[in-house]
Amino acid sequence: MDYLPIFTKLENRPCLVVGGGSIACRKIHLLLKAGADVTVCALEFNPSLLKQAANKELKILEQAFTEELLENKWLVIAATNKKQVNEHIATAAHAKQLLVNVVGQADISSFILPSIVDRSPLVVAISSGGKAPVLARLIRERLETLLPMHLGRLAAISAQFRHRVKEVIKVAPLRRRYWEKLFGNGMLANLLQKGQTEKAIALMETSLSEDITQGDVALVGAGPGDPSLLTLKALQLMQQADVVLYDRLVSSDILDLVRRDADLISVGKAAGNHEVEQSRTNQMLVEFAREGKKVVRLKGGDSFIFGRGGEELEELVEAGIAFQVVPGITAASGCSAYAGIPLTHRDFAQSVTFVTGHRKTDGEELNWQALAAPNQTLVVYMGLIQSQEIQTQLLSHGRAPETPVALVNKGTTSDQHVVIGQLSELEQLGGGLQGPTLMIIGEVVNLADKLAWYQSDNKPPLSRDPFLVNLA
């Protein structure tokens, strides 16, 4: 972040605005709404400022700027139409370590004013850091249509009731859950929208007697990597969580969307390297839920497709813990789509099979005869370290050596890299790849040249030469 968003209390604080035109008027309006003690310095004044001065809403000084005007001031805004004057004001204010904003010149300002959606006491601020003010304005206009006017009343009445809630619910996480439940069902907002304040207060009171001490677990699929592929429900639960247990494949960009105060616990697993044993993960889910916490078990892709989700839920059922499951976009769907490879196609594949290259025990055998059948697409999760076995078994069971193969590395992310070759060279294709890699085997891979649409930031989308992969 170039700027840290901070809401500052300006009530009765002395503020100076230099400039008396329309731009200055807009800044002064905001300062007055926040209760600031405003002095305006200019050689000429907009008529509205003269009227406000006559009404004792602000003070005006009909003079040029001098550095003495900065004495005892807390905040300064330079809004003249003269660049040299504005720069002089900024330099003088910086020397006195005052907060200063120069309109239209973020580079010499110590703070900037965001676009604002005002539903006081609820206020939303949007800023592009001065880089795209029109974009920030358009976002504000969009939010204005989404946030109803009665949100201010909702926040105000909640503030009046906070002390009562603290008296009844002593534990902070349970208080948060009370408010989430109250705000989440929409009943309170509907009553206030209709002006039924007494009924709204009654609802808040009766809701205090409901049992909110029981924790629960949400098994959430985080998708294949791109944060924008998260479902709305997944994001909602991540924002409500007390504890999040996440896997190795969940990216930092997705973890950044979790509620700031939530505890983040890595229970990541890689083949042959279990950071936390599965049994311990199951135990933690039960323990945290019994403590009354809202627990999110965050897994890459979809929890029910090679994600051990079923094993974890069986443990919760035995312990009597309430749970819900939120599906995610599985790697096969996400990575194939971003690589331009349809998993089925009437001309090439009438079926698709998902298998994992990381099985529970080494002795488990796949039905290689069925997997080697033509006119189907085979998708292998976590198959990179088993490339030699997969190649050998498919070839020995009759799959053609020239069968197209794609390896989608770090799919759907800005680091996505797709390597395409033939089944006969599968072992060599993955030689230079590290990180999560999905294997797609079948004639549909030939469509990637035509249908590939996603150009990642860091690498070319397609490579057909293993040597190039090793150089990447």
Curated annotation (Swiss-Prot):
Pathway in which this enzyme or protein is active: Cofactor biosynthesis; adenosylcobalamin biosynthesis; precorrin-2 from uroporphyrinogen III: step 1/1; Cofactor biosynthesis; adenosylcobalamin biosynthesis; sirohydrochlorin from precorrin-2: step 1/1; Porphyrin-containing compound metabolism; siroheme biosynthesis; precorrin-2 from uroporphyrinogen III: step 1/1; Porphyrin-containing compound metabolism; siroheme biosynthesis; siroheme from sirohydrochlorin: step 1/1
Keyword field: Cobalamin biosynthesis, Lyase, Methyltransferase, Multifunctional enzyme, NAD, Oxidoreductase, Phosphoprotein, Porphyrin biosynthesis, S-adenosyl-L-methionine, Transferase
EC code(s) of this entry: 2.1.1.107, 1.3.1.76, 4.99.1.4
Disulfide pattern: none
Residues with Phosphoserine modification: S128
Binding site for NAD(+): S22, I23, L43, E44
Pfam families: CysG_dimeriser, NAD_binding_7, Sirohm_synth_M, TP_methylase
Keyword Oxidoreductase appears in the UniProt entry: yes
Region described as Uroporphyrinogen-III C-methyltransferase: spans on this chain: 215-472
One Gene Ontology MF term: NAD binding
Residue stretches in coiled coil: none
Domain of life: Bacteria
InterPro entries cross-referenced by the UniProt entry: 4pyrrol_Mease (IPR000878), 4pyrrol_Methylase_sf (IPR035996), 4pyrrole_Mease_sub1 (IPR014777), 4pyrrole_Mease_sub2 (IPR014776), CobA/CysG_C (IPR006366), NAD(P)-bd_dom_sf (IPR036291), Siro_Cobalamin_biosynth (IPR050161), Sirohaem_synt_dimer_dom_sf (IPR037115)
Catalysed reactions, semicolon-separated: uroporphyrinogen III + 2 S-adenosyl-L-methionine = precorrin-2 + 2 S-adenosyl-L-homocysteine + H(+); precorrin-2 + NAD(+) = sirohydrochlorin + NADH + 2 H(+); siroheme + 2 H(+) = sirohydrochlorin + Fe(2+)
CDD domains, per the entry: SUMT
Positions contributing to S-adenosyl-L-methionine binding: P224, G300, G301, D302, I305, T330, A331, M382, G411
A Gene Ontology BP annotation from the UniProt entry: siroheme biosynthetic process
SUPFAM superfamilies assigned: NAD(P)-binding Rossmann-fold domains, Siroheme synthase middle domains-like, Tetrapyrrole methylase
Active site: D247, K269
Region (Precorrin-2 dehydrogenase /sirohydrochlorin ferrochelatase) location: 1-204
Keyword hit for Lyase: yes
Family per similarity comment: In the N-terminal section; belongs to the precorrin-2 dehydrogenase / sirohydrochlorin ferrochelatase family. In the C-terminal section; belongs to the precorrin methyltransferase family.
Alphabetized PANTHER family for the sequence: SIROHEME SYNTHASE, SIROHEME SYNTHASE-RELATED
The protein's role, per its UniProt record: Then it catalyzes the NAD-dependent ring dehydrogenation of precorrin-2 to yield sirohydrochlorin. Finally, it catalyzes the ferrochelation of sirohydrochlorin to yield siroheme.
UniProt protein name: Siroheme synthase
Native source organism of the sequence: Psychromonas ingrahamii (strain DSM 17664 / CCUG 51855 / 37)
Name of the encoding gene: cysG
